[in-house]
Curated annotation (Swiss-Prot):
InterPro entries, alphabetized: ACP, ACP-like_sf, PP-bd_ACP, Ppantetheine_attach_site
Domain Carrier: 2-77
Pathway participation: Lipid metabolism; fatty acid biosynthesis
Listed name of the protein: Acyl carrier protein
Positions carrying O-(pantetheine 4'-phosphoryl)serine: 37
Highest taxon, organism lineage: Bacteria
Subcellular location: Cytoplasm
Originating organism: Xylella fastidiosa (strain Temecula1 / ATCC 700964)
Keywords: Cytoplasm, Fatty acid biosynthesis, Fatty acid metabolism, Lipid biosynthesis, Lipid metabolism, Phosphopantetheine, Phosphoprotein
Protein modification: 4'-phosphopantetheine is transferred from CoA to a specific serine of apo-ACP by AcpS. This modification is essential for activity because fatty acids are bound in thioester linkage to the sulfhydryl of the prosthetic group.
Length: 79
């Protein structure tokens, strides 16, 4: 697991109040981890803080799983 993956999974576990072992790259925020719309906004904000980047609204809406978050951060040089 890469450093980015580990950091994303840790943030997801903390923000969604789930055990880190239950957070996999394929976990979806809403369906599998029980996030609501406020949780997802807070999660995106935490990712922005951790990786010192800005995640636009359109990208945030498409970010529905742990892997989507990891891919976005890896593919954006700002992160």
């Amino acid at each position: 697991m890469s450093d980015i993956e580990a950091r994303v999974r840790k943030i997801v576990a903390e923000k969604l109040n789930v055990d880190e072992e239950k957070v996999t790259n394929t976990s979806t925020f809403v369906d599998e981890l029980g996030a609501d719309s406020l949780d997802t906004v807070e999660l995106v904000m935490a990712l922005e803080d951790e990786f010192q980047c800005e995640i636009g609204d359109e990208a945030a809406e498409k970010m529905t799983s742990v892997q989507h978050a990891i891919d976005y951060i890896k593919s954006n040089a700002k992160c």
